[in-house]
């Protein structure tokens, strides 16, 4: 039911093109996953999402547990039915969201207890409960419950989080029993490469169908992210997909793919869209700016998404300046299309064995002109 195959490899980098088969379809890699935290990619319908060529989306276990609750979703036929999305879904474990609550939570080896940010009620989340919730939600790929240390954190704090992550992974594996779901483990270790090495070794020892690199994009500078990815990705098994969590800029994506990462997710493209910002080439354009008031060109002349095909910059400027919901949707659609198109361009370059030449600039610094 789950199968991952590497179809092409880059000669001069670790980049690869793959195919992950799931019960709800194929994920072609490398691939960017849109984030649908509450079972929706904000402001976008499932049909519109498919038009961006999105293949798999991420939903958030923590938030869906709080509202509407996994029982409601299970009764509706599972998350695919609930949100009318018939393609692959990945659910994260909720660990990052819980730990981001800071003083609202208490952590020990048993699990995490915290006050609900919605109504103040007391909630306990353990590895067993996180997996049970995800089994009820019915996603194709589910993530182990982990402890994501903040940045910065001392080595002692990060080492403790790693040990707890590995302990919890054992309990996640023991609890997970759904054959039509793939459980992925998560490598932690902060910016300490020796801890990353040990975590990669421990997680790989469980022989899971996929492994994620977690604990990045939590406030550390981009050069630290690159160092972690370059060090950790080669340590992971070749035969399983590698998922870099929380990454959504073209530079980070290019570095990740060059080092053998297969897919990634981020809220950035839709968050920027909701704030009136478009991703165009390697730049971010604020459509509120007056320079777009009488600019009648397509948003991105190289893009064929719904937004760029049908609307000009002046109209988008008008929508954004007047806080029209359509403007936020159109920019979000374009931004998602932009990153998904970039993913596909990297795949084609790997297949043609020109990835190291075509995408080398993106791995070094931002540039203003490109050919994809």
Swiss-Prot record:
Chain positions covered by the region annotation RNA binding: 246-252, 270-274
Cofactor mode of binding and number, as noted: Binds 1 zinc ion per subunit.
Keywords: Glycosyltransferase, Metal-binding, Queuosine biosynthesis, Transferase, tRNA processing, Zinc
GO cellular component, one term: cytosol
Molecular functions per Gene Ontology: metal ion binding; tRNA-guanosine(34) queuine transglycosylase activity
Source organism superkingdom: Bacteria
GO biological process: queuosine biosynthetic process; tRNA wobble guanine modification; tRNA-guanine transglycosylation
One Pfam family here: TGT
Keyword Metal-binding: yes
Keyword flag Transmembrane helix: no
UniProt binding sites for Zn(2+): 303, 305, 308, 334
Binding-site residues for substrate, renumbered to this chain: 92-96, 146, 188, 215
Entry annotation: catalytic residues: 92, 265
Catalyzed chemical reaction(s): 7-aminomethyl-7-carbaguanine + guanosine(34) in tRNA = 7-aminomethyl-7-carbaguanosine(34) in tRNA + guanine
Pathway: tRNA modification; tRNA-queuosine biosynthesis
InterPro entries with a match to the protein in the record: ArchSynthase1/Queuine_TRR, TGT, TGT-like_sf, tRNA_ribo_trans-like
Protein role: Catalyzes the base-exchange of a guanine (G) residue with the queuine precursor 7-aminomethyl-7-deazaguanine (PreQ1) at position 34 (anticodon wobble position) in tRNAs with GU(N) anticodons (tRNA-Asp, -Asn, -His and -Tyr). Catalysis occurs through a double-displacement mechanism. The nucleophile active site attacks the C1' of nucleotide 34 to detach the guanine base from the RNA, forming a covalent enzyme-RNA intermediate. The proton acceptor active site deprotonates the incoming PreQ1, allowing a nucleophilic attack on the C1' of the ribose to form the product.
Subunit comment: Homodimer. Within each dimer, one monomer is responsible for RNA recognition and catalysis, while the other monomer binds to the replacement base PreQ1.
UniProt record similarity statement: Belongs to the queuine tRNA-ribosyltransferase family.
Protein's UniProt name: Queuine tRNA-ribosyltransferase
Native source organism of the sequence: Prochlorococcus marinus (strain SARG / CCMP1375 / SS120)
Gene assigned in the entry: tgt
